[in-house]
Amino acid sequence: MSLTISSDALTRKVAALFEKCGSTASEAQQVAANLVLANLSGHDSHGVGMAARYVDAVLEGNLQPDATVKIQTDHGMMLGLDGCNGYGQTVGVQAMELAFERVAQHGCCIFSLADAHHLGRIGHYAEMAVERGLISLHFVSVWSRALVAPFGGSDARFGTNPCCIGIPLGWGDNTREPFVLDFATSRVAQGKMRVAHNEGRLAEPGTLIDEHGHPTLNPGVVVVPQSNGKTGALLPFGEHKGFGMAVACELLAGALSGGGTWHHTHDGRRAVINNMLSIVIDPARLGHQAFFAQEALDFIDWMRQSPAAPGTEGMMLAGEPERLARAQRLRDGIVIDDASWKELQDCERKLGLAG
């Protein structure tokens, strides 16, 4: 079962939770709107289903409302930032805004962000960049509980460690919708398994192993502890290739930022801590803006001439599925599964908001 709700009503409902937890009305609205935008974009895994976990993290003292990103090191075009365990949706945006200031001065900014609470959908930060005609690359590590097994391993050793690349397409009056590639280095995001578990759906073959290291289709193995108290694991996408990307994210985002890497036992906290290394570039500063813009469009047009494969509607560029989902869900509403809705209601009762 499920229910359908408008994005505005859902944002108000979730913002009330965060404001009750100590955020200003402005921050509560910003975080809630970011989560709802993930739902609108078709990524329910990163949407309001995370709200209950955020509330628990605040109540445990591991998520700090109204935190502000701090500059730890400053070398002009290079910044080392501390997220101070604040909402990723606010400190992540603050980090990007600092980067935009440095790009205006230097043409490029490289920054590390350590100890931010869950940054949400990383594509949001790439979208911020491409709206300004900038290119951005993001490497992220995840500190919560280990969820993904190394290629050739049989238990979870690290997080879903997403990567994201945003590239503007066109220039001036000939600007098109951008290329925004945002993906977990696991075959699927853990949140998608939470949604599948809540909805009673099976996972695709090759996605999961159980607590014994055997292949399984049961998404619950990475959502709830199994009979022996252990959990299963997600598998990396592309076998050794996705595994290699995940390791790169752990080293670039976790180690390089000062936030840390996975080599410890999870202590049961509900907080999800992200570290991120980001590179933001003004393509015009490389001296080939007009060529870059036209060449990018020519290449995209060339690809679109490929006939659709049997049983498909043809190629889609990264970012297009999200834009289509937003249009449809803004029109028809957002479908929330019963388990996620119950979690929101439980949070309201816990915080004294229930009517």
Please place each PLM-identified region on the residue numbering.
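N-terminal glycine-rich anion-binding loops that anchor highly charged ligand groups
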Residues: 2-10, 23-49, 63-74, 270-273, ...
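Catalytic-core signal marking the mid-to-C-terminal active-site face
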Residues: 4-5, 10, 20, 256, ...
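Active-site cofactor/substrate anionic-group-binding motifs, chiefly glycine-
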Residues: 46-100
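A generic, well-ordered mixed alpha/beta core segment in the N-terminal half of proteins
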Residues: 79-172, 180-183
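Phosphate/diphosphate-binding glycine-rich loops and adjacent basic-rich segments that engage nucleotide
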Residues: 148-223
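N-terminal nucleophile
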Residues: 155-158, 165-168, 184, 244-260, ...
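Small-residue-enriched flexible segments
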Residues: 190-258, 269-271
